[in-house]
A protein has these predicted regions:
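Bacterial N-terminal signal peptides that target proteins for export
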Residues: 1-12
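N-terminal secretory/targeting leader peptides
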Residues: 23-139, 155-394
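Bacterial Sec-type N-terminal signal peptides, specifically the leucine/valine-rich hydrophobic h-region
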Residues: 17-20
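Extended rod-forming repeat segments used as scaffolds/tethers
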Residues: 13-14, 384
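Core domains of carbohydrate- and sulfate-ester-processing enzymes
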Residues: 146-151
Length: 394
């Protein structure tokens, strides 16, 4: 009996010991519950600060604003353009350098303002006669189908060493010959006149005997009112009306051969461009193309209305530019182009590219397209000049 109790006690003690040993042993930690990572926060709308070279009241600035509106809609508000007018951040002629330095994200201007850096700049805006007879659509064909856009970007990035890209956006041609304080009938009438001209056009007029001065559009009318200049070229039509030119001079000559196919540009800092998502880049490309077309067709109607207002409200005399002056202008341009090509390889490269493209499309277009004046004169014959008073009864 005693032995049985002793064995039972021993067994019980062993069981308790084993039980206590098990309680003292740590269990392996249970894995932490899986927590789903929060979705990445959606990026908020991005705003690009851009400035133009134009006064706020001009339709050139309307082009810029329309572009900004289209980008906003095409990106569902995710990319916005702050389309500032000339002088709101930097002076009108400093927008290119400001974009390169990222003071601005972009700019709305025209390349011939930069001929002080390299005269090839004028070839991406407009040259006399197109060049080589090209109109605006031919020029755009060269840009997109003839290698022009690649040369344009090379001009900025390789020739000028600027960190920018550009797109054609502003078709403000063909442009009128200009405004004068007195009638002009020949080259001799240029002598002694000081005229606001810009870019390579100023050099051409200098060859033709005119004194020239460059200034932003907003300074033209005040300079005319002070008698600092005797004539000026701006754009023509609605732009000249809004600028106030009919209020200072009465003699307006058209057409001109200096900017028949002028195209302004949208400049964007290259780093800003690369940082944009692909969809926003495509939205900008699409908005540029739409702005070019929609603004241009509206502008033609505005120009027609402006011509009527110039005549009826301000008594403007809208006169035909003497052919002698236009031919002299083209000859002077050919001389300058030849001289510049001899010393500027990139100028020659671009001009040769334009000549090659024009050699195909201009003769073909002349063959296929009737002269604009043919049907225009049939339906809307020009009024003949009033007869002189020689036969007047005494």
């Amino acid at each position: 009996m005693r032995t049985a109790l002793k064995n039972a006690f021993t067994f019980a003690a062993l069981a308790v010991a084993l039980s206590l040993q098990g309680c003292g042993k740590e269990e392996p930690p249970k894995p932490a519950p899986k927590v789903e990572a929060p979705p990445p926060a959606a990026a908020g709308p991005k705003t690009l600060k851009m400035q133009s070279s134009w006064p706020a009241g001009l339709t050139l600035q309307d082009n810029f604003r329309f572009f900004a509106e289209r980008v906003d809609k095409l990106t569902s508000g995710q990319l916005k353009i702050d389309a500032l007018a000339a002088g709101q951040v930097v002076p009108a002629f400093e927008v290119l350098d400001a974009t390169h330095k990222k003071v601005l994200d972009g700019a709305h201007s025209v390349t011939y303002y930069w001929i002080g850096k390299n005269k090839a700049a004028t070839l991406f805006a407009s040259t006399p006669a197109g060049p080589f007879g090209m109109d605006t659509m031919d020029f755009m064909g060269w840009v997109y189908e003839g290698g022009g856009l690649e040369l344009w970007w090379d001009f900025y990035q390789k020739e000028l060493k600027l960190n920018v890209i550009a797109f054609p956006i502003l078709p403000s041609g063909p442009q009128a010959f200009g405004w004068f304080k007195r009638p002009i009938k020949s080259l001799a009438d240029f002598k002694g006149m000081k005229c606001r001209q810009t870019g390579i056009v100023a050099e051409i007029f200098q060859k033709m005997g005119m004194q020239t001065v460059n200034m932003p559009g907003g300074e033209i009318v005040p300079s005319a009112q002070r008698g600092v200049i005797d004539c000026a070229e701006w754009v023509g039509g609605i732009e000249d009306l809004r600028l106030g030119l009919p209020q200072v001079w009465k003699y307006h000559y058209t057409p001109g051969m200096h900017e028949p196919s002028i195209v302004g540009e949208l400049i964007i800092n290259a780093d800003v461009w690369k940082a944009l998502p692909a969809q926003q880049q495509e939205a900008i490309r699409s908005a540029v193309t739409e702005t070019f077309t929609r603004w241009w067709v509206k502008w033609q109607k505005q120009n027609a209305d402006a011509i009527v207002e110039m005549r009826t409200k301000y008594g403007t005399q809208i006169l035909r530019t003497p052919p002698e002056i236009l031919i002299a202008f083209l000859k002077a341009w050919d001389e300058i182009a030849k001289e510049e090509s001899a010393k500027n390889p990139f100028f020659k490269k671009v001009l040769d590219s334009q000549r090659e493209y024009a050699s195909k499309v201009v003769p073909a277009k002349r063959f296929m397209f009737p002269p604009y004046s043919f049907a225009a004169n049939y339906y809307w014959p020009e009024a003949k000049p009033a007869a002189k008073d020689e036969g007047k009864k005494k």
